[in-house]
């Protein structure tokens, strides 16, 4: 029933509202058969094969039944250039849960080879199952965790001023964009990243209040 509801809803949005892309949160919660069924249903629509479909690889802390798709594997079940897995380790800016840890753009020693793997969409790496470059989404920041700008400043300063211009951080911001925009795979840009968007050092936006 849940699978049918998902398929019917997505087909309705695609047909009635002409939505041409779908992003699945916590895609690891869904079983592979359901995700492939959604893809197959979209492909039956006029122009449906051009509709983008990708998802977050995680599944959060859950006690869901073991029938769910394996984390990081759901989108590899069907080899399709439209069936993308949002997994591009963010070595550009260090580990995302460690605010002070530098990445390649902040000059972390020994990180060059990590960047080499990321630029090539890990096609020659054993970190992921065999895949096409187009099955990888390349990005450095998203709605979760720190913005790129905040991460850059947190690495550089003990008490950063997030709204102040910083020429080094601006150059690092451009370098990060240059890397993933020219990498293999589908580039993903968080809205506002191009003008140094800040959440003032917060890892999430839940604590922010609209004024």
Spans of model-derived segments:
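Active-site neighborhood of glycoside hydrolase catalytic domains
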Residues: 1-65
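Conserved alpha/beta catalytic core and glycan-binding cleft of carbohydrate-active enzymes
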Residues: 39, 49-206
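Acyl/amide activation-and-transfer machinery of modular secondary-metabolite enzymes
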Residues: 208-211
């Amino acid at each position: 029933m849940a699978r049918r509801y998902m398929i019917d809803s997505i087909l309705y949005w695609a047909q009635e509202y002409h939505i041409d892309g779908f992003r699945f949160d916590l895609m690891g919660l869904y079983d592979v058969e359901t995700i492939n069924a959604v893809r197959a249903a979209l492909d039956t629509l006029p122009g449906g094969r051009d509709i983008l479909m990708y998802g977050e690889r995680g599944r959060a802390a859950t006690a869901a039944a073991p029938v769910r798709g394996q984390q990081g594997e759901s989108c590899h079940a069907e080899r399709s250039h439209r069936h993308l897995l949002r997994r591009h380790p963010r070595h550009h800016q260090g580990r995302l849960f460690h605010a002070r840890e530098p990445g390649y753009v902040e000059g972390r020693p020994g990180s060059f080879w990590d960047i080499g793997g990321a630029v090539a969409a890990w096609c020659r790496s054993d970190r992921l199952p065999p895949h096409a470059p187009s099955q990888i989404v390349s990005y450095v920041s998203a709605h979760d965790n720190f913005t790129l700008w905040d991460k850059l400043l947190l690495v550089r300063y003990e008490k950063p001023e997030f709204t102040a211009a910083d020429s080094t951080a601006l150059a690092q911001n451009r370098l990060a964009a240059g890397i993933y925009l020219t990498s293999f795979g589908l580039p993903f840009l968080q809205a506002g990243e191009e003008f140094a968007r800040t959440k003032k050092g917060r890892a999430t936006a839940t604590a922010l209040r609209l004024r």
